[in-house]
């Protein structure tokens, strides 16, 4: 039986708070950047559940030896920010995954076709098949960028079931495309909005995340 895409909207008050700050058109760039960083932190924390590789061991407490669970250092963990807006979530994600390798992927969207093309690719030629990959992309709108990113990753040996996507706002077109192409994929997002307009922006959304992060 095919496992469908799973989308989680964590009911965490800090996620809700920082989403409200990010949505507000009056939020200045410096505060918007902080909001996206915090969303990256808390959404990555949620995404790491039952995803980070662990192993059983023992530790010596001041009193006696006891069983313990630790992160398995032998299994690679990678974060792939989709440039440029994905960089906004990266700092928060790194506070949760400080030892993860960072592989930048630069994608640009054709404003007429809404299709994505790659202008920067720092992915390795091949990933270890056990690699856990976290993709950061604030807006999952039409699905062009995230589908291109998934294509680049799976071509290099990444198992879609070991991928976690962290976004701030997701919309049905992107989620439907992911569901049709990749079984077992899991998305963590602060909210799901219903509409994408003719320009490919999520409505109500939060505007152009990249422009607001970088003040351009």
From Swiss-Prot:
One of its GO terms (molecular function) is magnesium ion binding. Its EC number is 2.4.2.9. One of its GO terms (biological process) is UMP salvage. Keywords: Allosteric enzyme, Glycosyltransferase, GTP-binding, Magnesium, Nucleotide-binding, Transferase. 5-phospho-alpha-D-ribose 1-diphosphate binds at residues 84, 109, 137-145, 208. It catalyses: UMP + diphosphate = 5-phospho-alpha-D-ribose 1-diphosphate + uracil. Binds 1 Mg(2+) ion per subunit. The magnesium is bound as Mg-PRPP. Uracil binds at residues 202, 207-209. Pathway: Pyrimidine metabolism; UMP biosynthesis via salvage pathway; UMP from uracil: step 1/1. Belongs to the UPRTase family. Catalyzes the conversion of uracil and 5-phospho-alpha-D-ribose 1-diphosphate (PRPP) to UMP and diphosphate. This is Uracil phosphoribosyltransferase. It comes from Nostoc sp. (strain PCC 7120 / SAG 25.82 / UTEX 2576). The gene is upp.
């Amino acid at each position: 039986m095919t496992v469908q895409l799973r989308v989680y909207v964590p009911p965490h008050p800090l996620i809700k708070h920082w989403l409200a700050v990010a949505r507000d058109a009056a939020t200045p760039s410096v505060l918007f950047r902080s909001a996206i960083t915090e969303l990256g932190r808390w959404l990555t924390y949620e995404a790491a559940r039952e995803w980070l590789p662990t192993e059983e061991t023992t530790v010596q407490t001041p009193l006696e030896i006891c069983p313990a669970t630790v992160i398995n250092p032998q299994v690679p963990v990678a974060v792939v920010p989709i440039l440029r807006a994905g960089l906004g979530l990266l700092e928060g994600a790194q506070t949760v995954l400080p030892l993860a390798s960072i592989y930048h992927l630069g994608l640009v969207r054709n404003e007429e076709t809404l299709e994505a093309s790659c202008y920067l690719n720092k992915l390795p030629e091949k990933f270890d098949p056990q690699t856990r990959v976290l993709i950061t992309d604030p807006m999952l709108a039409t699905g062009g960028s995230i589908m291109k990113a998934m294509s680049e990753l799976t071509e290099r040996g990444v198992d879609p079931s070991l991928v976690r996507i962290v976004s701030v706002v997701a919309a049905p077109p992107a989620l439907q495309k992911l569901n049709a192409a990749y079984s077992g994929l899991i998305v963590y997002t602060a909210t799901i909005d219903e509409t994408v307009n003719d320009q490919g922006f999520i409505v109500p959304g939060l505007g152009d995340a990249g422009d607001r992060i970088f003040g351009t």
